[in-house]
């Protein structure tokens, strides 16, 4: 199938864009390419993450349905414990709901968005996820 366009990035609403951009920069690297009071744009390996201020922002209540999660971000890693510890040290918090902690670790970023570290698609991930 021919794509209509290239995927450029994802945008997350939050109360404090600079803080959230710096959190994700600690998680994935990259460079902050644009910053204003309302929007910060981080580029990681050609993929953009924008963080835009929403004064009425409310963190998702996942897995409870009160405030939907809207989106979440997955990171691939071969070191779940190390990745999780680094995220917690950078300001993330662990989700009490961990559906499959041997493969996925669910956390919340400082603004409350859920995100995961996973071995899925790596050499140590589940057999079904490995590239042939």
Predicted segments, located by residue:
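Short intrinsically disordered coil segments
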Residues: 65-68, 89-93, 132
